[in-house]
């Protein structure tokens, strides 16, 4: 087993600026798909998963402007929804766990989403059931295409409801919230995750 050995005896001094949190960044960046207006986000961490999500959004038609280190503006005014059905999109989503967070905003705003089975790190079970059960409660229907390993979700009009999540999933809660903000009526979520960066 590896370990850290820390030798003290020296007074610590100085200041640091912490990097933004990856999970929060993935959620907030995905939430920019909910509007056609420009959204500026600062303190975005410069890490692979986040950078890959930013590139993926740009390829979908989101206008991405980098103002400086960790400082971006996103404008999802002219999305190419047909790109979601492309082989390239499916391949890229399959290697990026954070891509699942685009489902809620796309379903809420455009009433449809096609997303690959996401990849990324493998901590615990990492199920998608919570996401899909939440979307289903809002009125979405989904079909898995086993040949392409994609999920297609459709909803003419999402409707607010009371729902009990089967687990307090952080990404599941965030995804359902992002879909619910575009739903008709009020949504109340029980057994929601309560991390401080839930949108």
Predicted regions and their residues:
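Structural preference for solvent-exposed beta-strand-turn elements
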Residues: 1-199
């Amino acid at each position: 087993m590896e370990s850290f050995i820390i030798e003290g005896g020296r007074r610590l001094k100085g200041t640091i600026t912490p990097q933004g949190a990856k999970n929060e960044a993935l959620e907030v960046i995905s939430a920019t798909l909910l509007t056609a207006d420009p959204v500026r986000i600062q303190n975005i961490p410069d890490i692979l998963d986040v950078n890959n999500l930013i590139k993926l959004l740009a390829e979908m038609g989101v206008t991405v402007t980098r103002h400086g280190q960790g400082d971006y503006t996103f404008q999802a005014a002219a999305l190419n929804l047909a790109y979601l059905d492309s082989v390239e999109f499916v391949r890229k989503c399959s290697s990026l766990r954070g891509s699942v967070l685009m489902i809620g905003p796309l379903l809420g705003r455009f009433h449809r989403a096609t997303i690959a089975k996401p990849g990324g790190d493998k901590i615990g079970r990492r199920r998608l059931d919570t996401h899909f059960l939440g979307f289903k409660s809002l009125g979405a229907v989904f079909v898995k295409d086993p040949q392409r390993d994609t999920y297609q979700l459709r909803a003419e009009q999402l409707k607010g409801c009371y729902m009990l999540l089967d687990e307090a999933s952080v990404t599941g809660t965030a995804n359902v919230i992002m879909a619910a903000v575009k739903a008709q009526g009020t949504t109340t979520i029980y057994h929601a995750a309560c991390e401080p960066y839930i949108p």
